[in-house]
């Protein structure tokens, strides 16, 4: 079973997760302060302010980075080089592979690409696997 850990502020990541879980049946867990994490999985978050990682996401990573296989982020291309920058920062700071970036709540093409990446690259992968940055 694939587990997805996500943080959503405006609802874009929530909508993305809803579509992914409806298609796949994967388990989604909304990040909450001090939540226990028993199963390893994939992080999906958003970029806030001007290319920053959300505080709740950052706290989650400090507590559970050893159980995160990959990171993906929602963003807005209007922010230019800051688009989805949270994923880049998390990938770099925690040595987690960057799976993908998607705009706002993602298109169906984004949803299918994410599912394909997780199924074929990161399902049951070992941490420390070679980074795949296709964002």
Where do the model's predicted regions map?
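FMN-binding flavodoxin-like domain, especially the glycine-rich phosphate-binding loop
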Residues: 23-27, 33, 38-135
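Short, charged N-terminal beta->alpha structural module
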Residues: 1-25
């Amino acid at each position: 079973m694939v587990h997805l850990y996500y943080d959503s502020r405006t609802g874009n990541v929530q909508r993305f997760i809803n579509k992914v879980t409806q298609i796949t049946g994967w388990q989604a867990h909304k990040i909450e302060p001090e939540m226990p994490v028993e199963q390893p999985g994939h992080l999906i978050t958003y970029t806030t302010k001007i290319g920053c990682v959300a505080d709740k996401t950052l706290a989650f990573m400090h507590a559970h980075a050893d159980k995160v296989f990959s990171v993906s982020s929602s963003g807005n291309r209007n922010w230019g080089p800051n688009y989805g920058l949270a994923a880049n920062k998390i990938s770099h700071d925690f040595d987690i592979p960057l799976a993908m970036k998607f705009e706002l709540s993602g298109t169906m093409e984004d949803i299918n690409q994410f599912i394909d990446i997780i199924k074929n690259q990161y399902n049951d992968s070992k941490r420390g696997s070679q980074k795949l940055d296709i964002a």
